[in-house]
Amino acid sequence: ILSCLVGSEMCIRDSQGSEKAFELNDQKMLRNALPDDRRYTYEIREILKLIADKESLIEIKKDYGRAIVTGFMRIEGHATAFIASDCKHLGGAVDSESADKASDFFDLCSDKNMPIVSFVDTPGFMVGPDSEKEGAVRRMSNLFKSGSKLVSPLVAIFLRKGYGLGAQALVGGSLHKPAFTAAWPTGEFGGMGSVSYTQLTLPTIPTGLI
C-alpha cells in the first residue's frame, strides 16, 4: 500500500489487481450478521469481509483510533475505500483519536479520488472532561472540515445507531453529503439515543421504563 500512496490517483485502484479477477463471498450470510438484540455487539471486520470480494480487504491503522476501522477493498471487482464504526470499542463512539484517524483517511481518499463506503454504528462523539482535555472540539471539528472538502463519492450504510453529530461526521459532515444512503433493518436515527434522551428529560425514571 505504501508504494501506492504516492503518484497518480489511479495507483491505489490498481494495487489490488485486475477488476475482472474477483470472487464474491456468500452474501446470504449477511442476513444474520447483526444480532437482533441491539444490546449485543458484533465483529465489524467479519461483516466487511463478507461484503468485500474474497481476499481483497486491506485494513490500515488497525491499532490506532480503534473505534473506527479504515482500509480498502473491492466490491464486484471495483476498488473502494471503507470507513466503519467498531461497536466493540467505546460502543462505536467517536473519540478524539478516532476523529483524527477518520479525518486523515478522508483527506487521503479525497487526494486519490477513491470512492468511500461508510458503515455507521455510533452513538455520537465521545464527550466529557477527559475528552475535552484531549482537544476533542478541535480534533472533531477537523473531521467535519475534511468531510466538507471531500470530493470522492461517498455511500453511507447505517448498520445500527446513527445518532448526533458523530454519525453526520462519518458520512462527510452532513446526512445530505452521501451520493446514496441505506440502512440495515436494525438502523436507528436521532439526535441522541432514546435512553440518553429519557435520562436528560425525566428527573426520575419510572421503574421498568428502561
Where in this protein do the model-derived segments appear?
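Single conserved hydrophobic/aromatic residue that forms the stacking wall/gate
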Residues: 1-12, 199-210
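Mobile "lid/hinge" segments at catalytic clefts and subdomain interfaces of large enzymes
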Residues: 8, 176-200
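Generic secondary-structure signature for well-ordered alpha-helical cores
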Residues: 8-9, 13, 35, 39, ...
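A glycine-rich phosphate-binding loop feature that marks nucleotide/adenosyl-phosphate handling sites
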Residues: 16-28, 66, 119-126, 159-167, ...
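Non-catalytic terminal/interface segments that mediate subunit docking, oligomerization
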Residues: 41-145
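Short coil/turn connectors at secondary-structure junctions
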Residues: 77-79, 112-115, 150-154, 176-178
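Phosphate/diphosphate-binding loops
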Residues: 129-174
